[in-house]
Amino acid sequence: MSLRSRAGDWLEDRAGTRSAARWALGEPVPGGARLTYVFGSALLALVLAQIATGFGLALYYSPSEASAWSSVFWIETQVTLGWLLRGLHHHGASVAVVVAALHLGQTLLFGAYRKPRELTWMIGVLLLFLLLAFALTGYLLPWDQRGYWATRVAMSMAATVPIMGGHLERLAQGGEGYGTLTLTRFYAIHAVLLPLVFLGLVGVHLALFRRRGITPPPAVEAGSGRAPRRAWTASGLARRSWTRWSRPRPCSPSWRSP
């Protein structure tokens, strides 16, 4: 027996690694693999990429009114592949929001919000709001004109909340004006608080998802576990559309002869 096999047996005996891997990877997929099942996994991969690129940016970023913009400029011009690092983080955030919207739409179409998956749906919606909070808090961090004025608009909207709006605005911006305290608060929320809450809810979301399984698409035949074959490619859709609309239809005149 090789050293690798012995190490694998030892880990399986102590920690159950092979059993855990079979549980994680041996998930039944109703109707077989399809594009509509990709959005959740793609979103998780994008979130992990955001964490990795965000950690790389945090090594060089300085959350200060005097040095925030210059540190971002340093990352893009002096750090090796810094422009790529920031580009992946910046554009990856936009892609993550789009994929989250697609994932939400897919769950709506499949009825994944119904019993017994209501809690999975509610946590997913909460994760979407947290993702938008990531976008809001991260937009200010470069301390450029777009981030500054976008944050002022967001804080002005927060100030309109009845009773506690003014307190929320002062708490978020660190006083009466915008400056270093605003940056440090947004940075702490963006890099520490939101990731902890987000990853915890992701774990709960995945556990609930694995408990109830994938919601089968409406086209899956009842009791068969598979979907009828359909041509979903561009050429297949074109052929189906042409066949349907080019069929001769009986003429039904709107007039009647005397």
What would you call each of these model-derived segments?
Residues M1-P258:
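Membrane-embedded alpha-helical bundles that constitute the cytochrome b-like, heme-associated redox core
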